[in-house]
């Protein structure tokens, strides 16, 4: 199994060990906003930590850790253009597999420009990109994201739109990867995620979105077992917990 979206820098070493013991082979840890992120230097140090420390912590725990670097819509400096210029330097690292997490949260024009610039980088560098959608105003945010994707003309195979739920899955009218987040306190229960996978034919990728808030380190094995128990097609199960993430991140 591959946990395709986490924030390991705010999780314990013991969590990594438990995930390895539960059958997780690879974990993707994404850039986010653990602080105010009020200056570019804070982001640069954050990216550096993910690449140089979180990968090593994974090795120590017996699980492969790969990294996504990007600028999160919930926290970024006013002069974020500096980070867009610096980001390509990090994309060459062998452990960086994607740009992200980026996306829309408050739906400001500045956020849209920030997302647009990261999408252009992903297009230019042929790099996968992880796009966040918010808990509130998710439909509105998704519609705006789809408009920006049309504008940038990035390949569908490079895009994962994340945190999708049963109210928004029908809005995705293209062959992008669709992220389902099993995080019962804020996003999907494992039962809800399983029902979406059972009833739709899309390129689903499951993740736990482990971070500083309440989450489930066993989200993937729990959902995998439940899908098996309710008769979800085995190919769909394997695709959602492993194969699609492997293809998206080119692991």
UniProtKB/Swiss-Prot annotation:
Presence of keyword Membrane: no
Transmembrane regions listed in the UniProt entry: none
Co-factor(s): a divalent metal cation
Keyword NAD: no
Top-level division of the source organism's lineage: Archaea
Record text on cofactor binding: Binds 2 divalent metal cations per subunit.
GO molecular function: hydrolase activity, acting on ester bonds; metal ion binding
Amino acids binding a divalent metal cation 2: 101, 132, 163
EC numbers, comma separated: 3.1.-.-
Keyword set, alphabetical order: Hydrolase, Metal-binding
Sequence positions that bind a divalent metal cation 1: 5, 7, 101, 209
Membership in a protein family: Belongs to the metallo-dependent hydrolases superfamily. TatD-type hydrolase family.
Protein name from the UniProt record: Uncharacterized metal-dependent hydrolase MJ0761
